Amino acid sequence: NTLLQVSDVIKTFGEVIALNGVSFNIKSGEVVGLVGSNGAGKTTLLRLMSGVYYPTSGNVTLGDGTPVHKMRGDLGVVPESTGLYSRLTAWENIRYHSRLYGIDDAVAWKRTLKFAQSLDMEENLSRYTKGFSRGMRQKTALLRALAHGPKVLLLDEPTAGLDITSARTVRALVEQIKQEGGTVVYSTHQLFEAQQVCDRIIIIHNGVVKADGSPAKLIEETNSDSLEEAYVSLTQEKARMRFEDIKS
């Protein structure tokens, strides 16, 4: 069951080609990692998938063919910059966002409380976000993205700048969502994190998909001893592997 489809997408900014011929599907229940170095195109791709950017050519659609920008309520987005209102409490930030999608406050609160328990954020929901640490702001952004019940959660470097404990908590939440049948797209440049969290990894290099498959298959198909070695091999060579060739 395909929830999100990226088809032959090219995205340019002036003469700069940020993404070049990117295609893949996201299926229900998958946790998919977008892995690449800084500037590889991960954030641009996530902004296209969330409907913030429009492709120069190609399409980004939901499974039924609807362009993503017309159905943003199906998506929960945690950008690299959390964009919280500092004069509002954590819950007020979450509630404001949920109301934009027509979600009843009681429904949003129930969802928020469920995940706040997992993130150890229950006691912080009534606090103003102005004094929040990076980790607390990131957790609030996660709760905000989940409160309206999205079909797909899009995370842009969700553990960047977090301490070890906060990063583990975020990864544990992704695992919880996965166990409950949720669908997550997880951008990271941390290979160990992608291997730990994701069922499937899409390696992006210079705006091109270099590989798409499970961590084990990427290692196997490159005759590597580790995912790090496989990544180096794939991004240094011009070989391109498609998911059709690397089936998990």
Residue spans of the language-model regions?
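ABC ATPase "signature
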Residues: D212-G213
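Helix-to-loop junction immediately C-terminal to a conserved catalytic motif
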Residues: S50
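Catalytic Walker B motif of ABC-type/P-loop ATPase nucleotide-binding domains
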Residues: L153-E157
